[in-house]
Regions:
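N-terminal export signals
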Residues: 8-27
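Catalytic domains of carbohydrate-active enzymes, especially glycoside hydrolases
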Residues: 74-99, 248-250, 254
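Aromatic-lined substrate-binding rim segments of carbohydrate-active enzymes
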Residues: 79-80, 92-142, 196-211
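An active-site-proximal structural segment forming one wall of the substrate-binding cleft
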Residues: 118-128, 151-177, 244
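Aromatic-lined carbohydrate-recognition surfaces of secreted/lumenal glycan-active proteins
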Residues: 137-148, 201-236, 257, 284-292
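Active-site groove signature of glycoside hydrolases
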Residues: 141-146, 165-192
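Aromatic- and acid-rich polysaccharide-binding/catalytic face
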Residues: 177-184, 237-266
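Substrate-binding cleft of secreted/luminal carbohydrate-active enzymes
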Residues: 259-263, 284-354
């Protein structure tokens, strides 16, 4: 049985702790305030803002290899606010469906055996784009047959129905419907690519009264192949994309090459080629600044800020027309499942001095 003296000693110790802990917490708070104040100055070793700003982002709701965040409209609304705060004015649905998973209740695709989605994401994105003064680009359907066969022509048949259907359901209804993303990703002279891009681009423009279209291929650099010796050379890249642009420039308005497959000291060389080719064919030259890190052994964390900065600086030097990213919600958003994404958002704001 506890004696009265032991009980009083315990009570005294508890009282002392009650006094000390708040003081410790208060002092920690002061240290944090001091640290935050110092960090807010963001004394960088490089000139601030000497790069292209990201003004567009893909929306990756039907993903190949990135975890789903399971957001509802409340989370998406908040994310559009975060985008707007750093100057994003364009959102691009990367694909409206992949194999059997789709983003809207498409009568045609449901008839082809696709699964019914629980919500109409296309309608939601268009409403949020209108709310925040953004333009929405619709990404076409990906049946997966191109990835299985490496023949792009398979994608034309399904999208012949999807394009007409989507314009009827949404394009005539929402002012925020601003264009089309032809979602097939290629890197080189892929079989059927020129014909497929031309057919789909032509139909998109005809049905919508000439709204803009774009593609986002990758550069077949050393990070895209298992053996760096097999990476595309600058001359090969220019020759093959000269041929592709020649065949599609009348129905594809812009090309946003993905920037993550080449090394950082190759950016200026390849970017200058891309801009020269785009200018030759009267196309807009965008960059798809990947905000995930291809240099890591896992797929895929948010990118280190300096790597993103180097790529955006190179895009500015090349005179590119627009910078978009793949993709804000996973890799730059303060509410991303990746903790590092919110820190990337903060570093980006510091660099461009965005309040």
């Amino acid at each position: 049985m506890e004696t009265r003296r032991k009980f009083l000693k315990k009570m005294a110790a508890a009282g002392a702790s009650a006094l000390v802990v708040p003081q410790l917490l208060a002092s920690c708070g002061k240290e944090e305030e001091t640290y935050e104040g110092a960090a807010g100055a963001a004394n960088l070793l490089v000139p601030k803002g000497d790069a292209m700003r990201i003004t567009g982002t893909f929306l990756d709701e039907i993903s190949h290899d990135i975890p789903h965040q399971n957001w509802g409209e409340r989370e998406w609304d908040r994310d559009f606010r975060y985008m707007k705060a750093i100057g994003i004015d364009t959102v691009i649905l990367i694909r409206s469906g992949y194999r059997k998973f789709i983003t809207y209740p498409s009568p045609y695709l449901l008839g082809q055996g696709c699964y019914m989605p629980s919500v109409d994401l296309v309608d939601m994105y268009l409403r949020l784009a209108e709310k925040y003064g953004m333009k929405f680009y619709f990404g076409l359907y990906d049946s997966g047959k191109y990835w299985d066969t490496h023949d792009m022509s398979h994608e034309v048949e399904h999208n012949r129905y999807v394009i007409d259907e989507v314009w009827r359901l949404y394009g005539e209804k929402y002012r925020s419907f601003g264009g089309w993303y032809i979602s097939g990703e290629i890197s080189r002279a892929t079989r059927g690519a020129i014909g497929a891009f031309h057919a789909m681009g032509k139909q998109c423009k005809e049905v919508s009264g000439g709204l803009p279209t774009f593609i986002s291929p990758w550069i077949d650099g050393k990070k895209a192949v298992s053996n760096a010796q097999n990476a595309v050379t600058a001359d090969e890249h220019e020759r093959e994309w000269d041929e592709i642009f020649d065949g599609i420039h009348d129905v594809v308005d812009a090309c946003a090459f993905q920037d993550g497959h080449i090394d950082y000291d190759e950016l200026d060389l390849f970017f200058s080629i891309n801009k020269r080719l785009a200018d030759k064919y009267g196309m807009k030259c965008w960059t798809n600044a990947e905000s995930f890190d291809r240099d890591m052994p896992i797929r895929f964390p948010p990118i280190k800020f300096d790597k993103l900065r180097l790529k955006l600086e190179a895009a500015k030097r090349a005179g590119y027309d627009k910078a978009i990213t793949f993709e804000f919600s996973h890799f730059m958003s303060p509410q991303s499942a990746y903790l590092q994404a919110g820190h990337l958002y903060d570093r980006y704001k510091e660099y461009f001095e965005i309040e």
